[in-house]
Amino acid sequence: MLPIETLAAPPELARSEPAWRLAAASFLIPGRLQREHGQRRLGTTAKWVAVAGWVLIAASAAGLLLAPVAVLTIALSPAGAPVIALTLGLFAAWWFVLGVHTAIVARRVSVSVKAASVAALVMVTVGALLLSSAPPAAATVTVLAARSAAAGFFTDAATPETWQGRWNIALLGGDADVDRDGQRIDSITVLSVDVDTGASLLISLPRGLQQIPLTDDSPLRSIWRSGVYDCGHACQLGFLYPYGEESWAELYAGEIPPGSSAGVEALRDGLEGLLELPVHGSVVIDYPGLAAVVDALGGVVVDVRERLPIGGDENQVGVAGWIEPGEQRLSGVEAAWFARSRMSTSEADRMERQQVLLTELLTQVNPAELALHTGTIADAVRSDLPTGMLPVLLRAADEVGSHGLEMLSFGDIDLEHPDVAAIRASVGDALGE
């Protein structure tokens, strides 16, 4: 317990400084009142605790500027977040108690004061508490919330082995509709990240691609014994997801990792068979989720090449507004329709816009901003990425923000009879194989 004594203030302080001013001054110079009222040890302790706090704040700020990936990796890790939160919590508790003690000393009363004096004391105490304990308490909540969100985004699955020093992640854009049950996949992209440098390649594939080779161990080979997912127009790459969700859950029973689903696993089998590279994880986000993320990040700047509708159908019925050509900072809803609009544009055009939007999001957002909005991101997406991928993904975000990323798009290929060998060769060349 901190010592609380009935103390007389020095005459000059009693005459010239009201209690609230003394309490405020003690926030700037912790322990001042205690030292001036004979409690030198407590006052000195308060001063050095404050110095330690400011040093930690300065070191954290410098770390975020000079080595953001390392700092955020520690702050969001299962081991680091509790330690940081505990430290901040102890600071908050210390400042809370010190604020009460300072207010009591400033009022020159003892713990046995009358009720009327307590009422007068409350206002000073509240001011001290708000000024002193609220920031570290809020920081504690922020760290715990960010870690909780990161835990919701990442899974506890084992970190996968790299493939040629890379991790490959399927980024899937969902398109739910009130007139249609379930969700279909509207955009399919594979992000390939070098685990050492963070250098990234974005591979964009058309959802309507047909004649997809399957992996050797795919459960779908029990249906397509030739090893090729092929039944004409009804067997498109993007259809693997809804088919898996609605019809093939039993085929994938026992093979679905945490955070994934039968639809994601079916699409993973198609991507791995087509590209001949392993897909180590997936992220699924629908258009409302995309809009929420873009809004949380303050919008995204893109170069709009043609006038695009917001809402409406192919006949411009129900259009709520327009996205005009030129460089625009798009809101969440505008960004979703920039990627989604089908009016007067081809599938290749849509793929290009989706790739542009994703690229701009990745290049305009730094790791610190991503960490601040982990809650929104975790609520908007579904992911099966293991926690062990976090440091590499933060490094990739930092690298992309500084140097951009490479892009490979297959928007203009033959959808019905794709040249699979040519697709694989292009991917291999882009990856430097």
Give each language-model segment a name.
Residues 39-42, 46, 73-87, 112-115:
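Membrane-interface helix-boundary signature
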Residues 33-42, 95-117:
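Cytoplasmic membrane-interface segments at the C-terminal ends of transmembrane helices
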Residues 1-16:
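Actinobacteria-biased recognition of intrinsically disordered, low-complexity terminal regions
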Residues 136-433:
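Non-catalytic, solvent-exposed segments at the cell envelope interface
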Residues 15-54:
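Hydrophobic, aromatic-rich membrane-embedded alpha-helical segments
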Residues 52-106:
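Membrane-embedded alpha-helical segments of integral membrane proteins
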Residues 1-5, 28, 32, 59, ...:
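N-terminal secretory targeting signals
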Residues 110-142:
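Internal/C-terminal transmembrane anchor helices
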